[in-house]
């Protein structure tokens, strides 16, 4: 007896809808943008970075999580698009069992979790750079590595917990959908991601303001003042990243909460008409390397411009000191 289960008519209708096809094509754009900008972001992080070595470890971990999500998401998106365009006239479109999708889903969810936890890890490392005295290279490297490993471990633990005791006896069209018995936990996960993104945003603002407030309490010695300026620049970059991440996660979790709460009073077609556009993690993943690349390049260009002004302008000693002070603002 065949154990194959075929897609229902409603699922096939969703696959062949113009809304679905447009969404699947558009969502591949941020996926490929992520791959391209990750390459350039890693290059500028290595060569022109405003970040310490410990922060670089965490940035690499964030790049890894973002690209892990995008690779797995792209595979399933292309597969669904292929089915939508070329296989819907077949007598049976076989569904996958939840059990055979288990490992794929766990790795996929760990990519999403890694993007959120990675931001928290970056802030924790920035807090260490701010409040720990003598935060020199060896100490910062150990801190960065410890936080990176912890983030990766927590990411995979989270994905396992979501489907911990799920019987996985159902069927689904794609391996990036949560099993039917784990839907409630997936909703909790979405809410936690949003709250954690909000926490990251508030924390990053507080750390940035603290460093800005005490910037000039550091004696005007090039080494200490430069490190203080480095902390301010890197923290403001992370602050901007967390703001973008929070907005996307708010749309993701709040949007799904609303449509799930009214699912009983709207049709299957209308539910998925909206749902396909509410999944924002591909855009979160794409924004990360883009913003890192932009912020590092703009900071580097600003420093070069200031140096050129120093070297090309004749000044008195007092004017030179004042200009140097302004450069650190």
UniProtKB/Swiss-Prot annotation:
It holds the Pfam family 7TM_GPCR_Sra. The chain crosses the membrane at residues 25-45, 103-123, 144-164, 188-208, 238-258, 273-293. Keywords: Membrane, Transmembrane, Transmembrane helix. The keyword Membrane applies. One of its GO terms (biological process) is detection of chemical stimulus involved in sensory perception. Disulfide bonds: none annotated. GO terms for cellular component: membrane. It is a multi-pass membrane protein. It is found in: Membrane. GO terms for molecular function: G protein-coupled receptor activity; olfactory receptor activity. Belongs to the nematode receptor-like protein sra family. PANTHER family: SERPENTINE RECEPTOR CLASS ALPHA-1-RELATED, SERPENTINE RECEPTOR CLASS ALPHA-10. This is Serpentine receptor class alpha-4. It comes from Caenorhabditis elegans. The gene is sra-4.
């Amino acid at each position: 007896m065949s154990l194959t289960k075929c897609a229902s008519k409603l699922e096939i209708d969703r696959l062949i809808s113009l809304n679905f096809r447009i969404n699947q094509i558009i969502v591949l754009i941020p996926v490929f943008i992520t791959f391209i900008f990750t390459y350039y972001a890693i290059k500028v992080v290595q060569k022109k970075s405003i970040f310490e070595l410990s922060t670089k470890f965490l940035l690499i971990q964030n790049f890894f999580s973002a690209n892990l999500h995008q690779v797995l998401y792209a595979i399933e998106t292309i597969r669904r698009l292929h089915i939508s365009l070329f296989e819907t006239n077949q007598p049976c479109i076989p569904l996958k069992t939840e059990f055979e999708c288990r490992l794929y889903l766990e790795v996929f969810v760990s990519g999403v979790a890694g993007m959120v936890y990675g931001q928290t890890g970056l802030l924790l490392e920035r807090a260490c750079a701010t409040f720990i005295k003598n935060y020199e290279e060896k100490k910062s490297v150990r801190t960065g590595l410890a936080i990176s490993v912890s983030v990766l471990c927590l990411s995979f633990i989270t994905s396992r917990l979501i489907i911990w005791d799920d019987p996985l006896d159902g069927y689904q069209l794609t391996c990036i959908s949560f099993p039917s018995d784990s839907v409630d936990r997936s909703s909790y996960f979405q809410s936690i991601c949003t709250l954690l993104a909000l926490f990251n945003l508030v924390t990053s603002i507080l750390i940035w303001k603290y460093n800005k407030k005490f910037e000039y309490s550091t004696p005007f010695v090039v080494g200490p003042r430069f490190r203080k300026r480095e902390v301010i620049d890197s923290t403001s970059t992370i602050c901007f990243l967390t703001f973008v991440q929070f907005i996307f996660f708010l749309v993701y979790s709040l949007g799904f909460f609303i449509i799930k709460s009214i699912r009983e009073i709207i049709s299957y077609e209308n539910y998925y008409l909206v749902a396909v556009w509410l999944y924002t993690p591909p855009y979160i993943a794409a924004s990360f390397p883009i913003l890192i690349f932009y912020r590092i390049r703009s900071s580097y260009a600003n420093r070069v411009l200031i140096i050129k002004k120093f070297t090309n302008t004749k000044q008195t000693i007092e004017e030179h000191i004042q200009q140097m002070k302004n450069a650190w603002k």
